[in-house]
Amino acid sequence: TPLYSSAASDVYKRQAMDQFDVIVVGGGSGGSAVAGRLVQDGKSVCLLEAGGRNNSMLVKTPGMMPFLRGAVNYRYETVPQKGLNGRTGYQPRGKGLGGSSAINAMIYIRGNSWDYDNWEQLGCTGWAYDDVLPYFKRAEHNVRGGGDYHGGDGPLWVSDQHWPNQTSRDFVEAAASLQIPVNRDFNGERQAGVGLYQVTQR
């Protein structure tokens, strides 16, 4: 239920705290996975999401992301970027159940391992890629099965694209002919290269 005022917010908070062990804010991939794990642990959970159910066909059709408006997309802009000659950067962020995963064409690519390792070098203890990888694996149910970089029994289904576009295949083939390394797993040991990414679909 959306919270429309601070007074209403206080009422909902008091009621929720009386009825639930835990309140999770945000119904995106992270919040939904956290809520699911807590329920498995026997907790009663209230999952709060500012947006709606995301039943629109625009949300359910991966190629429609450019047409998503404010009801399902916060449509953030960055501050002017020096490296972009003062331009701002568009940052789509999902509003509704599924969060940004509902409007990202179901693409499943983790952050680059170098970034995580760099965060730890900057003082963020516990954020090295080797530290966070077990959590990625625990969340993932990859149809390729579990292994060094993938989980096989988590709540988030990850699979190869069922119907990859022929243009995408042609692009990969053209890049390979130019000696650009083909990468069949962007969430594996090596993240650079060209290839078809996996998606969050069954």
Residue ranges, per PLM feature:
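Loop/helix-junction capping segments adjacent to catalytic residues or to phosphate/diphosphate-binding pockets
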Residues: 11, 32, 165
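Single conserved hydrophobic/aromatic residue that forms the stacking wall/gate
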Residues: 1-15
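Conserved redox-cofactor binding core of oxidoreductases
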Residues: 121-202
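N-terminal glycine-rich phosphate/pyrophosphate-binding loop and immediately adjacent elements
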Residues: 14-138
